[in-house]
């Protein structure tokens, strides 16, 4: 099935942002974007990705979309939008349905962090995955590439979660959407908009 969505030809009809793939495999978002290019599948990079907008753009040939959350810090949002423009992103996907973070019980139970903390349980787990460890040691991308440099101290999921809970703006309105649209000036897709 082929279709066109905001001027992008694609062979599938659904599209979702990719983030944290860099925790599963070194440079995971870059690899996902390259695979998407190879197979003609659209790619959208998440704000909360391990690889930055610039990292993905430097390792791909086709434009990709960038997914954005509305946060209270408008200077940060404006800077992200400018970075997406500079990287040649062809559309901005504005997420509307994540203004209040849910509890990810498995992540809390497993004490998931990025990069992994060196606990005895994690050391045993990593010892059984030498290929993953070698890949992670070889890459420079181990943190949230789109957040680092703005939010000091955001180096694992629990600090990112606290920062996000403080930054995600539950008072999201159509005025905010208009502000993002004016900042972006390009193709804008609203994600998470439903009729009730």
Predicted regions and their residues:
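Alpha/beta enzyme core
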Residues: 20, 34, 55, 59, ...
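A gly/proline- and charged-residue-enriched helix-loop-helix capping module
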Residues: 38-59, 63-77
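Single conserved hydrophobic/aromatic residue that forms the stacking wall/gate
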Residues: 1-12
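Glycine-rich active-site/cofactor-binding loop and its immediate structural neighborhood
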Residues: 13-48
